[in-house]
Amino acid sequence: PEAILANQLDIKKCNREGLDELKFALVVQSVMELPTTYITGYNSKRFDDELIRYLFYRNLIDPYRWGWAEGNKRIDVMDHVLLAYAFGRDVGLQFPVVDGQASLKLEHIAEENRFEARNHHDALNDTKNTKSIMEIIRSQRPQLFDFALGLVEEEVTKNRILDSNLLYHVGTR
């Protein structure tokens, strides 16, 4: 009910024009399993990916294949933001402070940086805000951007760990 209210969905319209869950899951699968797709989101590994897995599981679709098959990769832009925040905040982003602590929530970063898309928890606006963050990091700190992007490659990550004398962990947990 909260998501319906937050997204201002009309239940009657959804019932009239929407898809049943299995058909919806198959449409999502067909898009997410396109070869060499980079599935990108903000805080997606901790939220969206889990929802997709559960949707697929309930509908007897392999819940993990979409993230690795056909050369696909999962990118969580929040990981880029965490790296930017932890290793020099000179990336062109302003990091908001909420209740005395830095906030890396997408809506707070969007407000602090005056992004055009301000309707939070709207999928299209969240996508625009995520894209804005990536464009800023890529233009201001291309090495950081490329380093973080490389972390989606298993071999790259393994080699970085094995070749390094110094290892950092940056995360929310």
Model-identified regions with their sequence ranges:
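Metal-dependent phosphoesterase core characteristic of DEDDh/y 3'-5' exonuclease domains
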Residues: 1-10, 30-143, 148
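A short, conserved beta-strand element enriched in hydrophobic/aromatic residues
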Residues: 12-14
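Glycine-rich, highly charged phosphate/nucleotide-binding loops
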Residues: 16-27
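Acidic two-metal-ion nuclease catalytic site recognized across multiple nuclease folds
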Residues: 135-173
